[in-house]
Curated annotation (Swiss-Prot):
Family, per entry: Belongs to the asfivirus MGF 360 family.
Protein name in the entry: Protein MGF 360-19R
Cited function: Plays a role in virus cell tropism, and may be required for efficient virus replication in macrophages.
Entry annotated with the keyword Oxidoreductase: no
GO biological process: taxis
InterPro entries, per database record: ASFV_MGF360
Xref: Pfam families: ASFV_360 (PF01671)
Alphabetic keyword roster: ANK repeat
The organism's taxonomic lineage, starting at the top: Viruses, Varidnaviria, Bamfordvirae, Nucleocytoviricota, Pokkesviricetes
ANK repeats: 66-98
Length: 362
C-alpha cells in the first residue's frame, strides 16, 4: 500500500487542480496521469458537496458523483488503478461488490478488505445511500449499476417498496405492478429524473426507452413538472385525454398547481379535479380548483363525508364565501405558468383562514 504521504499528495493534486504557468499543459497532464488522476481521457477533480461528502468530477460526470459511486463504476469497468485510488481516499470497498464482473476484480477487492458477499439488506442499503445524490449523472449511473444486476433479483420487496415510496409516493403501487425488477428499476430512475427535472437523465432514458413515454408523462403530471409535460404534449407523445391527465395531477401529491393549471387550460373538468383532490385529501389542490372555478360543493362534500374527512366537509360547507380567482390568464406556456404560480397561495384558502382561524394549518 502507498504511504500516507503519497495518498495525501494525490488528494492535494486532485483538489487544487491548477495548471502551472511554468510548465506546459501536456506536462501537467502527464504528471496527473502518472499519479493515476486520470479518467475518461481527462483529469480527475476531487471536491466536496454541501454535506461535506467527497465527490469525483470528470467530463462525463460534470455534476460530480459520490466517492463510493465512483468506486462502483471503477469496479464495473475493471479499472484496477482507480479502484485502489478511490479506496485509498476512503471509499467503502464493500460498495464495489455491487458491480464486480470478473474474478480478478473480486480478488483485488478482497485484498483491499472487502467481505465475501453482501447480504440482501446491504444491497438495498447501498442503493438507498446512493440515491441521496439527485443529479443526472447519478441517475444514469444507478441505472447502469443496479437495473440488470443479479444482486437485485432476490432483494426483499418490502424494503424495495419503502425506497420506492420515499421517492415516488402514491405512484409506488403503479410502479410495482410491472413484471420484472429491471423494468421497475428503470422506471424508478426515470421517474426520479422527471421529478427533479434532470434534463440530461430524462434525455438518456427517453432515447433508450421510447415505450416508457406514458410513464414519463405520468411522472411529469404527478410531480408538477409542467416543462416536461408541455414538451411531451406538443410533440404528440401524450396518449391520455385531458381529464385523465388532470386526475393524475390532482391525486399523487398536494400543491401540484402548475400541472393542474396546465390541464385546466387544455379543457379538463375542474369539478372532477376537485373530487379527485378530495378523495386524496389534497387540501391545497382543493382550494386551487375552487380558485379556478370549481363549484360542485354539494357533491364534493358528500364524497368527503363518505371518506370520513371531516375537515374537508367543513371546508366545502363554506361555499358561500368562495369565488373564482380572476388573476389567471389563458396562456399555455410553461414559463408563464411557472412565473404566475411561483410562491402561489390559493386566494380561497386565505378567505377560509380568515373565516376559520386555527382550523387548518398549511
Amino acid at each position: 500500500m502507498p504511504s500516507t504521504l503519497q495518498v495525501l499528495a494525490k488528494k492535494v493534486l486532485a483538489l487544487e487542480h491548477k495548471e502551472n504557468d511554468h510548465i506546459s499543459r501536456e506536462y501537467y497532464y502527464h504528471i496527473l496521469k502518472c499519479c493515476g488522476l486520470w479518467w475518461h481521457e481527462a483529469p480527475i477533480i476531487l471536491c466536496f458537496n454541501g454535506s461535506k461528502q467527497m465527490m469525483i468530477k470528470t467530463p462525463i460526470f460534470e455534476e460530480g458523483i459520490l466517492l463510493n459511486t465512483a468506486l462502483m463504476k471503477a469496479v464495473q469497468d475493471n479499472n484496477y488503478e482507480l479502484i485502489k485510488l478511490f479506496t485509498e481516499w476512503g471509499a467503502n470497498i464493500n460498495y464495489g461488490l455491487i458491480s464486480i464482473n470478473t474474478e480478478y476484480t473480486r480478488d483485488l477487492c478482497r485484498k483491499l478488505g472487502a467481505k465475501e458477499r453482501l447480504e440482501r439488506h446491504e444491497v438495498i442499503q447501498i442503493m438507498f445511500k446512493i440515491l441521496d445524490d439527485t443529479t443526472s449523472s447519478n441517475m444514469i449511473l444507478c441505472h447502469e449499476l443496479f437495473t440488470n444486476n443479479p444482486l437485485l433479483e432476490n432483494v426483499n420487496m418490502g424494503q424495495m417498496r419503502m425506497i420506492i415510496h420515499w421517492r415516488m409516493k402514491n405512484l409506488t403501487d403503479l410502479l410495482l405492478n410491472n413484471n420484472s425488477i429491471s423494468e421497475i428499476l428503470t422506471k424508478f430512475w426515470y421517474g426520479i429524473a422527471v421529478k427533479y427535472n434532470l434534463k440530461d437523465a430524462i434525455q438518456y432514458f427517453y432515447q433508450r426507452f421510447i415505450n416508457f413515454n406514458e410513464w414519463r408523462v405520468t411522472c411529469a403530471l404527478s410531480f408538477n413538472n409542467v416543462n416536461d409535460l408541455h414538451k411531451m404534449y406538443i410533440t404528440e407523445r401524450v396518449h391520455m385525454n385531458n381529464d385523465e391527465m388532470m386526475n393524475l395531477a390532482c391525486s399523487i401529491q398536494d400543491k401540484n398547481f402548475s400541472t393542474i393549471y396546465y390541464c385546466f387550460l387544455l379543457g379538463a373538468n375542474i369539478n372532477q379535479a376537485m373530487f379527485i383532490s378530495v378523495l386524496n385529501y389534497n387540501i391545497f389542490n382543493i382550494f386551487f380548483c375552487i380558485d379556478l372555478g370549481a363549484d360542485a360543493f354539494k357533491e364534493g362534500k358528500a364524497l368527503a363525508k363518505q371518506k370520513g374527512y371531516n375537515e374537508i366537509v367543513e371546508i366545502l360547507s363554506l361555499d358561500i364565501i368562495y369565488s373564482p380567482n380572476t388573476d389567471f390568464s389563458s396562456k399555455i406556456k410553461p414559463e408563464h405558468i411557472s412565473f404566475l404560480l411561483k410562491n402561489f397561495y390559493p386566494k380561497n384558502l386565505y378567505i377560509f383562514d380568515r373565516c376559520k382561524p386555527g382550523l387548518y394549518y398549511p
